[in-house]
A protein has these predicted regions:
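Active-site donor-binding segments of glycosyltransferases and PAPS-dependent sulfotransferases
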Residues: 68-70, 78-83
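Amide-donor transfer/coupling interface in amidating biosynthetic enzymes
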Residues: 1-74, 95, 99, 126, ...
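Short, Asp-centered acidic motifs that coordinate Mg2+ and/or phosphate
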Residues: 102
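Cysteine-nucleophile active-site neighborhood
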Residues: 105-174
Length: 241
């Protein structure tokens, strides 16, 4: 089913060449389908690459998806033009009164910094708190998963002796959870990071349910509040990790 974006979003041409059905707002108005509204907080420096990766993944759903991109206001982007951000991105101020069916918060290349030293940390924590009343289900990817573990549950990340990088074998722990429906019992997924929250700390948190993990790489997927919060620790959505 189609992805709805602004008509002249640059990555639209690439998606169409890949036979992904993308439509603009004008055409969407004539579709007698209630779309699901997804907000994407894009924290990655190369925003257009991340847009493409996430829209490819969202195109696999049978539902019509209405995507809104958001960027933080408290950080000056150096790798994406201001004109692109002004044209295709909303800010928290713009959307804070809205509600969304789902939200994706991407990773960011700041994992070796203390959370409080990230220049947009205060804004991000406000956004994370806002999701609890304005978003039905949120998925936190990579560094954002670490940020959510720290902010909501007080779990600290720890530096690794050497960078974790590569494909690792994982196993599904609870097949009854819809989020892992369609997963193989054992599957490969990539990780690329310098820090981790120990898997034992996550298992020990009564508010979290681990859905998939690796003996070598630790957490891959966890959830809280019956799926209102979902944490994906690998880099399976990225082609440029």
């Amino acid at each position: 089913m189609p992805i709805k974006t602004q008509g002249d979003l640059p990555v639209k041409e690439i998606l169409e060449r890949e036979n992904i059905f993308v439509m603009d707002e004008k055409r969407a108005m004539h579709q007698d389908i209630r779309p699901i509204h997804i907000l994407i907080l894009n924290l990655m420096p190369l925003k257009e690459e991340t847009e493409l990766q996430l829209l490819r993944s969202l195109s696999n759903t049978p539902l019509q998806v209405d995507v809104t991109f958001m960027a933080v206001e408290s950080h000056e982007a150096k790798n994406t033009s201001l004109s692109h951000l002004n044209k295709f991105y909303e800010t928290f101020t713009d959307i804070k009164k809205s509600k969304f069916d789902g939200m994706i918060i991407t990773g960011a290349p700041v994992e070796q910094m203390p959370f409080e030293e990230v220049d947009y940390w205060n804004e991000l924590t406000e956004i994370m708190d806002w999701t609890e009343k304005h978003v039905t289900s949120t998925i936190f990817l990579c560094w954002a998963a670490q940020a959510s573990l720290y902010h909501f549950y007080g779990l600290e990340k720890k530096p690794l002796d050497k960078k974790m990088f590569g494909l690792f074998q994982h196993r599904v722990l609870n097949r009854k959870i819809p989020l892992v429906r369609g997963f193989d019992d054992v599957f490969l997924a990539p990780h690329s990071r310098h820090t981790e929250v120990p898997i034992a700390d996550i298992h020990a948190c009564k508010d979290l349910t681990v859905l998939a993990e690796s003996e070598e790489a630790g957490l891959f997927l966890a959830m809280a509040e019956g799926g209102r919060k979902n944490l994906c620790y690998g880099t399976s959505g990225n082609t440029t990790a």
